Design a protein with these regions (language model features):
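Short aromatic-centered micro-motifs
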Residues: 32, 137, 522, 747, ...
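Extracellular/periplasmic, surface-exposed regions of secreted and cell-surface proteins
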Residues: 87, 134, 226, 236, ...
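Conserved small-residue
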Residues: 203-243, 593, 680, 697-794, ...
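Short Gly/aromatic-enriched secondary-structure transition segments
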Residues: 218-220, 427-429, 493, 725-726, ...
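Short, small/polar-rich motifs associated with maturation and membrane association
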Residues: 1-306, 311-320, 362, 393-394, ...
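Glycine-rich, aromatic-lined ligand/substrate-binding cores of catalytic
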Residues: 793-826
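Extracytoplasmic gating/loop element in the C-terminal half of outer-membrane beta-barrel translocons
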Residues: 237-239, 249, 377, 818-902
Length: 940
């Protein structure tokens, strides 16, 4: 930026540094500014040569930490900040899309490929078992509610990625302990864009996209099915297959189109009130027919200053509305199974007054079969599933620099997070799926649920900072926090005619958090640093005697590169050692009242029928009056480095984490509690890992710039205690597949979380699996389905991210990708199939995978480790090519055009569609699409 000093007259240079400016006087002075370089003031002349000097201090990112900010070079904890230039390129429907593969120690896995879908985010693999492992997410100073909503949803789905200025990830206890009770799993601080002191600026961006599926499951074609079925033993010779040739996967998938538009305006009111307003619209069709995601967003902020800049009021409000026309994800699995010799329609008119409404369904005489796979096309066309979410997050942050004692700042932050959701499911009478549901008589339904959540907070804190004798830098912070969470749920189920089919469902709950916290920072001569924090939290989820938890931390830092023996090094430009220890707490469990007796509305499948109406029952919850905080201790040693004037820079961290008093769900002896399952403090878990990040600028000339970045994480977790008496037979089952009590994973002492627990498949001399034969612990082979801990977990032992960008003048080309290794995937799609499943005793048929035919398994082998596969993969996430037009009609206008491809390619040995499944159980969810996009970004 080039400004005429003392005026608002200015311009910007082109990519080569050339500029022209008309000044008001021959004696004018130009002020030249550029990020990462020291400001230059120079008297104007007709021809000017200006050389700017890099500013190493300015190059240091300022990172946001709890209740304050700090230069990255002064941070003693494990903290990573990424900014818009670092975000993944291409279409970013949700905020978490920008984080994939970007931060060491952070694993982001989308829950499905549906537009607007949520994601599982894990920092250092999580610290708990039965309690939440989600990180705390703080948006502009407001810790947001991350509990789920009915019908699915995305915790931060209402935040427009285009409004985000930075993500700051806090990983070790020194960085997170200031958040105390909710920080055991790390913290992600989202800071949105603010106004600036510059002149009025406008930005418009748009993105047009086309999405396609990358691969279909390999099932038998109609002709192959007609040829194979008669060879299956037990199939009566009198049965007749259909004459159609239907590719059911083709029938449910489509090429999907999407569009996104964003507009923002920023500037200042008079001289002391910068502001920014933005609106956004996103409309994305899913690759599964009828699926659509639509979002409207508004983000507004203004930061007026008063009393000679001593008082700053920062007002922020974010409002979003999401309308998600969902699909029942079972349609993907049903398309795999449905008989390919049957037509989509029966030949009758659509909507015909007959069972199925014109869509093919299996009939037993004149009555639909009660047990059958639903017609996937009918599921899409006849079911109307909508999830509408309105959310607003906002706060008023007040900062007062005390007059005549400006080193002391008083702060108040009042915030809120309010959410309203409405989930509806409408199915007409006589739709095929209404003959296989609870009603089984073809009666349609109108299901309507409403959920309300309110989260209010108040933070009052003071900051004091002073430099003594130019070498002693001291700062302190102390504060008080209060937060209230409330939620309510109501649901009704009616027939299309308005008749009540189920009794109404209602619940309401709340909890409070109360906190006192403080932090001390001291550094000497910009070389030696110490940070200490202390936080005391009370949670209403625990009884009075166990309500308070105390969470301390301490961290040391040493800037080795500032020592005399390295200060003048031409090779080493930065070297800082970090050491930290701290404790954090956990109280995020499903029940807000786990220490007292409560009753919960039953599941729909546990309803009972009285007359023609179904009634919900109430079941007692198990409780533990002595339940208390889960506590995690973390040790961290880290090294930040830079070489060749930071042309090469990065960090290395090693951490050890120990969680005790695990909030764990365990079985208890019947009769000793209201339930045979309770949540209590029992168990311990160890977690350790290494994180490595390196960034380099191999080429940086006048016209060329090439940057490369990579991060790698290794992590290992082990459960060290789980029950009162730990033994091989005393473990917690998890990893449900289908049906009551069917699980394939365990929590077991000596194992990693989510270790697969299966029977060891026996093979013949040719390496072919022997049906119904398993290897026993003594090495013998028998038909006994003896399960064992496989030592193979759904959790990766390592994962990495990679990105590179090449810039030539106004052109830029970028590639990014990520991968995970050491994890295993249970292919339930394949395990749930067997040769005999092609025909049922009722007389209906189901398709199978080609591999099922080849394996020859006649009967279901759900617990065979034959279906457990390596889940290693590396995915090229994004490739983009862009061009920027400078100075379109004035010096401050620019236009950037970008073409991008997402989900470019996945390299894996996994036999299913996609190995990236956080649970490690492949139930054939909505596939991730490949997306082609064209975007434009206009600034003026």
């Amino acid at each position: 930026n080039i400004l005429e000093k003392g005026t608002t007259n200015g311009t910007i240079s082109d990519v080569d540094g050339n500029f022209t400016i008309a000044v008001s006087s021959p004696k004018a002075v130009l002020l030249i500014k550029y990020i990462g370089y020291k400001d230059v003031e120079k008297a104007v002349s007709p021809m000017m040569k200006i050389v700017m000097e890099e500013d190493s201090e300015m190059l240091e990112d300022v990172v946001v930490i709890g209740y304050g900010s700090v230069k990255k070079s002064d941070a003693t904890g494990s903290v990573t900040a990424i900014k818009p230039d670092d975000f993944n390129k291409g279409l970013r429907t949700t905020a978490q899309d920008a984080l994939v593969g970007k931060v060491p120690g952070v694993n982001v896995v989308a829950s499905s490929g549906a537009p607007g879908a949520g994601a599982t985010i894990r920092i250092r693999s999580g610290a708990s078992l039965s309690a939440s492992n989600d990180p705390l997410i703080v948006v502009d100073g407001v810790p947001v509610d991350n509990s789920t909503i009915e019908g699915g949803g995305n915790v931060i789905g209402g935040i427009n990625p285009n409004d985000i200025e930075t993500f700051t990830v806090l990983k070790d206890a020194s960085a997170t302990a200031i958040y105390g009770s909710r920080a055991s799993n790390g913290v992600i601080v989202i800071t949105t864009k603010k106004g600036s002191d510059s002149n009025l600026r406008f930005n418009y961006s748009t993105n047009l996209s086309v999405s396609t599926i990358t691969e279909k499951l390999d099932v038998l074609s109609a002709d192959e099915f007609r040829e194979f079925v008669p060879t299956v033993s037990g199939v009566p010779g009198s049965v007749t297959l259909g004459t159609a040739s239907t590719d059911w996967q083709d029938e449910i998938y489509r090429t999907a189109f999407g569009q996104e538009h964003n507009f923002s305006v920023s500037g200042k009111v008079k001289k002391n009130a910068p502001y920014r307003l933005s609106v956004g619209y996103n409309n994305q069709n899913g690759v599964v027919k009828t699926n659509n995601y639509e979002r409207f967003t508004f983000n507004g902020g203004i930061s007026p200053k008063f009393f000679d800049n001593h008082l700053t009021v920062d007002l922020n409000v974010k409002v979003s509305y999401e309308d998600n026309q969902k699909v029942d994800e079972s349609v993907v699995n049903n398309a795999l199974r449905y008989d390919p010799t049957r037509p989509v329609m029966t030949g009758s008119a659509t909507g015909a007054d007959e069972p199925g409404l014109g869509y093919f369904i299996w009939m037993n005489g004149n009555s639909p079969m009660a047990i059958q796979t639903d017609n996937p096309v009918a599921q899409l066309e006849l079911q109307d599933l909508h999830n509408k979410v309105t959310r607003s997050i906002g706060n008023a942050a007040i900062n007062y620099k005390v007059h005549r004692l400006e080193d002391l700042q008083l702060n108040a932050n009042l915030g809120y997070d309010v959410l309203k959701s409405k989930y509806t499911k409408n199915v007409p009478d006589m739709a095929g799926m209404m003959y296989t549901s609870n009603m089984k008589d073809g009666t349609g339904l109108v299901y309507d649920s409403k959920q309300n959540k309110r989260n209010y907070l108040l933070d009052l804190y003071a900051n004091y900072a002073h430099v003594f004798n130019e070498k002693h830098n001291f700062s302190a912070m102390a504060g008080y926090g209060w937060q209230h969470f409330w939620k309510k749920f109501d649901a009704t189920t009616l027939s299309p005619e308005g008749k009540e089919l189920f009794s109404p469902n209602h619940y309401e709950s709340e909890y409070y958090l109360l906190s006192f916290y403080g932090r001390l920072n001291y550094s000497y001569d910009n070389r030696y640093m110490i940070t200490a924090t202390l936080r005391s939290d009370a949670s209403s989820r625990f009884a009075k005697d166990n309500r308070w938890g105390l969470f301390p931390s301490v961290a040391l830092g040493w800037k080795i590169s500032q020592e005399a023996f390295l200060r003048d090094s031409e090779v080493l430009s930065d070297l800082k050692l970090r050491l930290s220890y701290g404790q954090t707490g956990q109280q995020d469990i499903l029940n807000d009242y786990p220490y007292m007796t409560t009753f919960t509305v039953s599941y729909p499948e546990s309803c009972y029928q009285f007359g023609d109406k179904w009634y919900y029952t109430y079941r007692p919850n198990g409780y533990d009056s002595d339940i208390k905080w889960e506590t995690t201790e973390t040790y961290n040693i880290g090294l930040d480095y830079g070489f060749l004037n930071n042309r090469i820079y990065g960090s290395v961290d090693y951490y050890q984490r120990h969680t005790k008093d695990l909030l764990n769900t365990i079985n208890v002896i019947s009769g000793t509690n209201y339930s045979s399952v309770i949540t209590t403090n029992i168990g311990e878990m160890d977690n350790k890992g290494v994180e490595f990040a390196i960034n380099a600028v191999p080429v940086h000339t006048k016209n060329w710039k090439w940057t490369v970045g990579m991060n790698y994480t290794w992590n290992d977790s082990e459960i060290t205690k789980l029950n009162v008496i730990d033994s091989d037979a005393n473990f917690v089952q998890t990893g449900a597949i289908s049906g009551t009590g069917k699980t394939v994973q365990v929590f077991m002492v000596g194992q990693r979380p989510y270790t697969f627990y299966l029977a060891k498949q026996a093979y013949d001399d040719d390496g072919k699996p022997m049906e119904g034969q398993y290897v026993q612990p003594d090495g013998s082979i028998s038909a006994t389905e003896t399960k064992y801990a496989t030592d193979k977990s759904a959790l990766p032992t390592s994962y990495l991210g990679f990105n590179t960008q090449l810039t030539y003048k106004n052109w830029d080309f970028a590639i990014s990708g990520h991968g995970a290794f050491g994890n295993y995937v249970y292919n339930y799609v394949a395990a749930d199939q067997y040769v005999q499943s092609v025909y049922s005793d009722q007389g209906n048929f189901s398709n199978i995978l080609r591999r099922t035919k080849d394996s020859g398994f006649q009967n279901q082998q759900l617990y065979s480790d034959y279906f457990l596969e390596k889940g290693n993969f590396f995915r090229i996430d994004n490739i983009s090519l862009g061009y920027t037009f400078q100075k379109l009609w004035n010096s401050s206008s620019s236009l950037r055009l970008t073409f991008g491809v997402q989900n470019v390619a996945t390299f894996t040995s996994y036999s299913g569609i996609d190995p990236e499944i956080y649970s490690g159980i492949d139930k054939e969810v909505y596939p991730r699409p490949r997306v082609f996009s064209l975007s434009a970004n206009l600034n003026f």
